[in-house]
């Protein structure tokens, strides 16, 4: 069953994301440090009439990496061609894409860490010197063809920057670390989305939604839609603070943005293992979730909010976790 707090794209959200996508830096809410840097780099590239250096955007899902890539293209006034690491299966696939680029174009590769190594190696000379050498044929009849490329900008997006190879990472001249959003920025995003979709919501309700959205605009917009449904059926269609509280309680999203699975992880650690340390494999078995799912989907937010610690001997529930769930804390 899909989690409403999953920060990956669900259902038709890709279309919804495009509808809500800001076009320029001044419309982009949050990520102020990244925006400030890109405003300078983009303007400098435009004044020199050069392509922008290659860009690596990294951070958790749902924080606007794809949106930022489109914003950069709009600010530069150039075309953007989009693909993803898993979609580029063979070196020939990438060569075909590169061969279609016009001078100054942006090639955006989402999930770039998932590209096969054989494909990644084609990028090295393309990024550094704007050419590729490709082999045609096989065996004794094989030959190398040199193909010059126009100057272009590669924007790579990843949720797993540590999985990038050193040679690929070194070829990005600009990096942008997308961080979890502050409450005030998420509140503004909720209110902007409500305006676009003609949803009536008061400021306190928007703030409550922001507080429980795990620092992620995609989750905030998803929760807004579900609370809108609740307000339409249970209330008079207007989203108030009270309606928001009731709807999120129905959705099992508590005041800290934890859902039933997050709470199950913490309760299991406290009730069965005295708060830990407990190994990831043991914890995964007890809550009937895959090890990678726990590590990649649930743990990051619990750690970021201070409910969970990773230690050399295992996971440990913090005093904040005990207090939040109403357990007496025993420091062992």
UniProtKB/Swiss-Prot annotation:
Q: Which domain of life is it from?
A: Bacteria
Gene3D superfamilies given in the database record: 1.10.8.60, P-loop containing nucleotide triphosphate hydrolases, Winged helix-like DNA-binding domain superfamily/Winged helix DNA-binding domain
Q: What is its EC number?
A: 3.6.4.-
Q: Record's family?
A: Belongs to the RuvB family.
Described function: The RuvA-RuvB-RuvC complex processes Holliday junction (HJ) DNA during genetic recombination and DNA repair, while the RuvA-RuvB complex plays an important role in the rescue of blocked DNA replication forks via replication fork reversal (RFR). RuvA specifically binds to HJ cruciform DNA, conferring on it an open structure. The RuvB hexamer acts as an ATP-dependent pump, pulling dsDNA into and through the RuvAB complex. RuvB forms 2 homohexamers on either side of HJ DNA bound by 1 or 2 RuvA tetramers; 4 subunits per hexamer contact DNA at a time.
Q: How does it assemble?
A: Homohexamer. Forms an RuvA(8)-RuvB(12)-Holliday junction (HJ) complex. HJ DNA is sandwiched between 2 RuvA tetramers; dsDNA enters through RuvA and exits via RuvB. An RuvB hexamer assembles on each DNA strand where it exits the tetramer. Each RuvB hexamer is contacted by two RuvA subunits (via domain III) on 2 adjacent RuvB subunits; this complex drives branch migration. In the full resolvosome a probable DNA-RuvA(4)-RuvB(12)-RuvC(2) complex forms which resolves the HJ.
Q: What is this protein called?
A: Holliday junction branch migration complex subunit RuvB
Its source organism is Streptococcus pyogenes serotype M1
Gene name, Swiss-Prot/TrEMBL: ruvB
